[in-house]
Each structure stands twice: as C-alpha cells, then as structure tokens.
Regions:
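Histidine-acidic metal/acid-base catalytic patches
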Residues: 13, 51, 67-89, 93-170
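Active-site acidic/histidine proton-transfer and metal-coordination neighborhood
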Residues: 4-86, 96
Length: 170
C-alpha cells in the first residue's frame, strides 16, 4: 500500500482498502513479507480510520495466489493482530475452496469487513449456479450483518439482463 493511499481514501470518505496478497511461492519469507506489509498498511490506515481488507482467492482461478483460503486469512489476521485488518469474504472463492458458507459466516462474522458474492461455477450472476442466494441473503441478514454486500460476477448475458436476480433476492 502506498503511503498516500489512506490519505486518498480518507479524502473521499472511503472506509475500506482492499489489498492483494499476490502470486508468490508459498514460502516462509513470502508469509513474513505479507504480514509485515499488512502491519505497515494497517498502521497507516488507522491514522485515517480506515480498515484494510484481505481476500482469499481460490487456487483454481488464481494458481499460486498467496492467500487462498479462509483459514489462512484468519491465521494472518491473528498474526498481524490489528483491529483494522478484516477479511473480504467472497462467497464465490470460499465456496470453491471450502464450501459451507453460512457456517463460516456465522463463525467468523466479527472478522469480516465486507461480503462479496458471485455464483459457482464460473463466477456468474447469483441466480445461475449452485448457491441459493435468496436463502443466503436472508440468513446473512438474520445473523446481524450490517455491512455492505458487493456483487462481483461475470454475467452470462448483458449486464442489464443479468440483474434480474435482484427481484428474487431482496
């Protein structure tokens, strides 16, 4: 994270900055560097009341990605030990790597800073795959999530036509 990123984010009232782990060899040196960079980023961001988000990405779509599952993200969060380091819980990536979305959401809700979604397989719109999003959205609401939900998917049709899922999900 650039030193000025948190200043820029604060100037537009942005509350979160998503940082990527990158494609690395899964070495101890890479892990130590990642954690040290997160300590630096969280310290700079905390001066502006900003949260740093880390996102596990599945290894099928992103081979070699350093942070590839929720357990590793939790270990990283614990090691860095900063209150403004949270997890971007991407339902698509978690489903591909580990599944059991609702259990993981319930268990780790205080660690989560943002929830993203797309369906499996293929990172498609929410009404076109194996995840029952109307049910999951209702469950997310019932467990007390007060943050944003972000759609990040690759539409099978035009963007406008792909938004039909909203009527059935809200």
């Amino acid at each position: 994270m650039c030193i000025r990123d948190s200043e820029y984010a604060a100037s537009i009232n942005c509350q979160n900055i998503h940082v990527i782990a990158g494609i690395t060899g899964k070495t101890q040196e890479a892990e130590e560097t990642f954690r040290e960079n997160l300590r630096y980023a969280t310290q700079k961001a905390s001066n502006h009341g900003i949260t740093i988000l880390i996102e596990p990405l599945n290894l099928l779509d992103t081979p070699g990605y350093h942070l590839s599952d929720l357990d590793h993200a939790i270990e990283t969060q614990d090691a860095v030990n900063k209150p403004n380091l949270k997890i971007m819980f991407d339902c698509y990536h978690i489903q591909v790597m580990q599944g059991n979305l609702l259990l993981r959401l319930k268990e780790h809700l205080p660690r989560i800073g943002h929830i993203q979604f797309a369906n499996c397989p293929g990172r498609t719109e929410p009404d076109s795959g194996e995840i029952n999003f109307p049910w999951l959205f209702a469950e997310i609401d019932s467990i007390g999530w007060e943050g944003y939900l972000g759609a990040e998917y690759i539409p099978k049709k035009s963007t406008e036509d792909s938004l039909g899922w909203i009527r059935n999900s809200l």
